[in-house]
């Protein structure tokens, strides 16, 4: 397994030497500046690749090995008028990446909103801060700020009472911050920042699309792109929904083991794989992460390793330290390592320590939400320690125990 680091480019304030010092060898990056639906050119890719891979004397090299993500446009997700054009641009971007030896591509199929949190600086018991999804605050946004048509039917009376109490206690600053957190697109999102009116309009464009319809559109997309990916040796890795359930009445179709099984059955192409994100899938108590990893091991080409802690009835959660929370990280790494040992060197699983607590010096710095250096470095070191220990006792390990 190869250790990677998500890098948002030189503007994000994380020098590549910091990545080296964290112990990573591979970079996960993307051309976030290119508008959704527009083709990535070879010149743009080469410029970013050279920036990453030009190695100063005496430094160890870094390799741009994973793209996260080429955005999938709303027209593709809705099978809209521009779907054919946007799929063509997506394929052209994939071909340009493959020509530059970047052959693992992460993407998602979440409509309107990408990954979603209500609180970007939840204070933990150590004084570090973490990201959190508070179900009641989310409901307050949906019911009283967004005022989504028909939202009431998605919440129980108890939920509605709690949401109103939270909303009535919020001042204007808190309301604006919640809008920013939910509607303005978190770092790495493949959806666009939205004003409240634009948010409502975008939701209306999905009014006639249920889960079965969205899944058909995903299958149509994969049927178009996987033959090209297979011919190029590219691996496509579908990221789970985050959180893995419906938001705003929208369908989500990559939330469970059954969801992925249906996708792989519909499009069994070798290039059709998954990004195994333990933090996203782990939010659901009914997702057995080791079982999912074991079942789909051959299709896992990229992994986000992080943990979450469910609160109350499980709909509220916060991001835990990497070896804490509700994720059996040791058990999962055992399965991934077992799979990785079966593979040729060029097909190794690439992973990154996903997200991280904001701690120590990072508490005083402007950081990319979810992606502070120190918290991610700590997580990567902890994961590396598990891998080193498991490798050392590999001959003694029985995966059936």
Curated annotation (Swiss-Prot):
A GO biological process held by the record: D-glucuronate catabolic process
One Pfam assignment: UxuA
Superkingdom per UniProt: Bacteria
Alphabetical list of InterPro entries matching this protein: Man_deHydtase, Xyl_isomerase-like_sf
Keyword NADP: no
Keyword Lyase part of the UniProt annotation: yes
Function: Catalyzes the dehydration of D-mannonate.
Matches recorded under HAMAP family: UxuA
Name assigned to this protein: Mannonate dehydratase
Source organism of the structure: Brucella canis (strain ATCC 23365 / NCTC 10854 / RM-666)
The gene coding this protein: uxuA
């Amino acid at each position: 397994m190869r250790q990677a680091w998500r890098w948002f480019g030189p503007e994000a304030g994380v020098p590549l030497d910091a990545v080296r010092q964290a112990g990573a060898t591979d970079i996960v990056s993307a051309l976030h500046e290119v508008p959704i639906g527009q083709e990535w050119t070879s010149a743009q890719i080469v410029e970013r690749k050279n920036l990453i891979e030009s190695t100063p004397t005496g430094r160890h090299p870094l390799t741009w090995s994973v793209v996260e993500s080429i955005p999938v446009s709303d027209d593709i997700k809705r099978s809209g008028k521009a779907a054919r054009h946007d799929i063509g641009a997506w394929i052209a971007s994939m071909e340009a990446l493959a020509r530059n030896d970047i052959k693992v591509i992460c993407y998602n199929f979440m409509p309107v909103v990408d990954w979603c949190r209500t609180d970007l600086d939840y204070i933990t018991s150590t004084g570090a801060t973490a990201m959190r999804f508070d179900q009641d605050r989310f409901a307050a946004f949906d019911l009283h700020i967004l005022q989504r048509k028909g939202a009431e039917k998605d919440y129980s009376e108890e939920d509605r009472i709690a949401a109103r109490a939270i909303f009535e206690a919020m001042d204007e600053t808190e309301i604006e911050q919640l809008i920013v957190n939910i509607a303005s697109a978190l770092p790495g999102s493949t959806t666009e920042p939205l004003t409240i009116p634009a948010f409502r309009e975008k939701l209306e464009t999905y009014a006639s699309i249920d889960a079965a319809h969205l899944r058909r559109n995903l299958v149509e997309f994969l049927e178009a792109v996987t033959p090209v990916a297979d011919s190029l040796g590219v691996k496509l890795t579908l990221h789970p929904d985050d959180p893995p359930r419906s938001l705003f009445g929208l369908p989500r179709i990559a939330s469970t083991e059954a969801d992925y099984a249906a996708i792989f059955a519909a499009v069994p192409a070798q290039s059709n794989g998954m990004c195994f994100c333990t933090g996203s899938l782990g939010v659901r108590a009914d997702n057995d992460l080791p079982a999912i990893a074991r079942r789909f091991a051959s299709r896992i080409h990229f992994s986000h390793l992080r943990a979450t802690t469910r609160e109350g009835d499980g709909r509220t959660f916060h991001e835990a330290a990497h070896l804490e929370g509700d994720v059996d990280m040791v058990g999962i790494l055992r399965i991934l390592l077992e799979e990785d040992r079966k593979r040729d060197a060029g097909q190794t699983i690439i992973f990154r320590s996903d997200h991280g607590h904001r701690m120590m010096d990072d508490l005083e710095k402007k950081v990319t939400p979810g992606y502070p250096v120190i918290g991610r470095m700590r997580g990567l070191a902890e994961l590396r320690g598990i891998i080193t220990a498991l490798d050392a006792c590999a001959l003694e390990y029985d995966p059936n125990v």
